Swiss-Prot record:
It catalyses: RX + glutathione = an S-substituted glutathione + a halide anion + H(+); L-dehydroascorbate + 2 glutathione = glutathione disulfide + L-ascorbate. Glutathione binds at K8, D19, K47, V60, S74, H160, W207. Involved in ascorbate homeostasis. Maintains redox pools of ascorbate by recycling dihydroascorbate (DHA) to ascorbate. Involved in scavenging reactive oxygen species (ROS) under oxidative stresses. Possesses dehydroascorbate reductase (DHAR) activity in vitro. May function via a ping-pong reaction mechanism with an electron transfer at the active site. Possesses chaperone-like activity in vitro. GO terms for cellular component: cytosol. This is Probable glutathione S-transferase DHAR1, cytosolic. Residues 10-89 form the GST N-terminal domain. Changing K47A: No effect on catalytic activity. Belongs to the GST superfamily. DHAR family. The gene is DHAR1. Disulfide bonds: none annotated.
Length: 213
């Protein structure tokens, strides 16, 4: 039995890769390590019984490294992949592991915000500015010249941020954050990212119910 990973299918399109950034993080890790895998698309609105048996909470992604044991949680899965397939190393030094870690929660708060004066935009800008300063000092990636786990965690989240905020709020990352722009361009142009990203329309469809709630 080979490596298998269950990931979210697109909303309304069960045969198309969906918009889960945590699923994409696992796929990116496998792609960057050149690990062959079988991808199983899960319709999260109509979860099959076999999937609920291996993931009782119904969450994606879940990963099977070939031993029949299914593992949930992208943090745990990517660590298991790193240990099982150590080359090339994607280890991020502990002091850099949390770089950009607050961006996604700030993005979702701002995206759902109906009050322009609630501080959610400022909070997101503060986190993006912190990423800018880190990349300016240590870039082009979080750990310098080589891509690492922290980048593969952040890349799908920045993609969601870029697509969703422009669509729903007409908002873009400020142009003066030049290192952040160079960073997203470097990440989004990688073969691994192009292969594993959701189409923009599926990403927008995934966020629409949350934005309009």
């Amino acid at each position: 039995m080979g490596v298998e990973v269950c990931v979210k299918a697109a909303v309304g399109h069960p045969d198309t890769l969906g918009d889960c950034p945590f699923s994409q993080r696992v796929l990116l890790t496998l792609e960057e390590k050149k690990v062959p895998y079988e991808m199983k698309l899960i319709d999260v609105q109509n979860k099959p019984d076999w999937f609920l048996k291996i993931s009782p909470e119904g969450k994606v992604p879940v990963f099977n490294g070939g031993d029949g044991k299914w593992i949930p949680d992208s943090d745990v899965i990517t660590q298991v992949i790193e240990e099982k397939y150590p080359t090339p190393s994607l280890v991020t030094p502990p002091e850099y592991a949390s770089v950009g870690s607050k961006i996604f929660s700030c993005f979702t708060t701002f995206l759902k915000s109906k009050d322009p004066n609630d501080g959610s935009e400022k909070a997101l800008l503060t986190e993006l500015q912190a990423l800018e300063e880190h990349l300016k000092a240590h870039g082009p990636f979080i750990n310098g010249q080589n891509i690492s786990a922290a980048d593969l965690s952040l890349a799908p989240k920045l993609y969601h941020l870029q697509v969703a905020l422009e669509h729903f709020k007409g908002w873009k990352i400020p142009e003066d954050l030049t290192n952040v722009h160079a960073y997203t361009e470097a990440l989004f142009s990688r073969e691994s990212f192009i292969k594993t990203k959701a189409a923009k329309e599926h990403l927008i469809a995934g966020w629409a119910p949350k934005v309009n709630a």
